[in-house]
């Protein structure tokens, strides 16, 4: 529905209106392309939603009557306003130009507008099309999501605007390169922990700055012990065993020795836990403290463990995590042993 499409004049004016404007309703001869005669309206007028649109019609002194219409609805006839919409105002009515303005334009104002004139010969009309552009707007987007590693996810971003906006998805990550999807829907099969983070939806149509919204994707996975560090400490000194684990949600840590759990508050020993790191601290190491300790990291998706050794000076340490092991010892003795055997023979 165009400007004033639902408004009516008082009944007292109806008959007079019909008689005065009978010749103006577009039954006149349309002005053909390239016709140099009047009236001559503007080319298509393009404005943004909320702006004002000016419709101009070039005429000359042969015109006896003139009017602007929106489809079959009369907006102005001469200096008389036939539309009750306060947004429509007369700008000029001279011997050379007849112009109106539509203020605070909205999408329902879009459509054809006709400049109709009466001369001594016959009515003529000229038409202009009003195009209303609308800034992009994201009307629907997925909520933040938490999902287990290996599952599939689908993200949605619906945007409106005129012209229809282009929607793109991008993974906000140092490892992500460019756009991951140029569509309203982003689907990820078998998601990995590296694909967690923020996903940015952008809607653009060159009418205004792109509109951007973000969705946070949290990928849950079981603990993985990335570092388990043993240490050699003399008796009477302070020693620390460290166990670092990556997990979402964050891992909970427990320490064991000889299948017995070490609890907080044991004399001379302190367990210090952080979201991804646990420390077993000995304030005054004794001979009894030496040996293998087991760090267990767990969350709701699983658990893992690593064996860590507290040893004295010159002893060999072993740290095992799954199938991997690391040994540190007196490897400098090996070349001397080989040299001794060669000299013997």
Curated annotation (Swiss-Prot):
Keyword Glycoprotein: yes
Lipidation feature positions (GPI-anchor amidated asparagine): 321
A single BP term in Gene Ontology: cell adhesion
Top-level taxon of the source organism: Eukaryota
InterPro entries (UniProt xref): Ig-like_dom, Ig-like_dom_sf, Ig-like_fold, Ig_I-set, Ig_sub, Ig_sub2, IgLON_domain
Membrane disposition: Lipid-anchor; GPI-anchor
GO cellular component, one term: plasma membrane
Keywords: Cell adhesion, Cell membrane, Disulfide bond, Glycoprotein, GPI-anchor, Immunoglobulin domain, Lipoprotein, Membrane, Repeat, Signal
Glycosylation sites: 44, 70, 152, 284, 292, 305, 321
Gene3D superfamilies xref list: Immunoglobulins
Disulfide bridges in this chain: 57-115, 157-201, 243-295
Signal peptide feature range: 1-30
Keyword Lipoprotein: yes
Domain Ig-like C2-type span(s) in chain numbering: 39-126, 136-218, 222-309
Propeptide regions on this chain: 322-345
Localization, UniProt: Cell membrane
Cross-referenced PROSITE patterns: IG_LIKE
Function: Neural cell adhesion molecule.
Record family assignment: Belongs to the immunoglobulin superfamily. IgLON family.
UniProt name for this protein: Neurotrimin
């Amino acid at each position: 529905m165009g400007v004033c499409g639902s408004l009516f004049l008082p009944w007292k004016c109806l008959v007079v209106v019909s008689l005065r404007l009978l010749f103006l309703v577009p039954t006149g001869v349309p002005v053909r392309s390239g016709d140099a005669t009047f009236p001559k309206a503007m080319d298509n007028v393009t404005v943004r939603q909320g702006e004002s649109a000016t419709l101009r019609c070039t005429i000359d002194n042969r015109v006896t009557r003139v009017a602007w219409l929106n489809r079959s609805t009369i907006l102005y006839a001469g200096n008389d306003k036939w539309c009750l919409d306060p947004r429509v105002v007369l700008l000029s009515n001279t011997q050379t130009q007849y112009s109106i303005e539509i203020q605070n334009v909205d999408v329902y104002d879009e459509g054809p507008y006709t400049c109709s004139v009466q001369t001594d010969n016959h009515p003529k009309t000229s038409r202009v099309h009003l195009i209303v552009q609308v800034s992009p707007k994201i009307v629907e987007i997925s909520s933040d999501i938490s999902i287990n590693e290996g599952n599939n996810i689908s993200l949605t971003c619906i945007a409106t605007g005129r012209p229809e906006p282009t929607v793109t998805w991008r993974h906000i990550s140092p490892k992500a390169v460019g756009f991951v999807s140029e569509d309203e829907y982003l689907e990820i099969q078998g998601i990995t922990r590296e694909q967690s983070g923020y996903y940015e939806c952008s809607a653009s149509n060159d009418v205004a700055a792109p509109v951007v919204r973000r969705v946070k994707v949290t990928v849950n996975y079981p603990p993985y012990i990335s570092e388990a560090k043993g240490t050699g400490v003399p008796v009477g000194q302070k020693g620390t065993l460290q166990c670092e684990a990556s997990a979402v949600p964050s891992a909970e840590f427990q320490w064991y020795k000889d299948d017995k759990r070490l609890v907080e508050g044991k004399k001379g020993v302190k367990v210090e836990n952080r979201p991804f790191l646990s420390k077993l601290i000995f304030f005054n190491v004794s001979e009894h403290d030496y040996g293998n300790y087991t760090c267990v990291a767990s969350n709701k998706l699983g658990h893992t463990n690593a064996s860590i050794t507290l040893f004295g000076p010159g002893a060999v340490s072993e740290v095992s995590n799954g199938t991997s092991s690391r040994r540190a010892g007196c490897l400098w003795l090996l070349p001397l042993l080989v040299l001794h055997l060669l000299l013997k023979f």
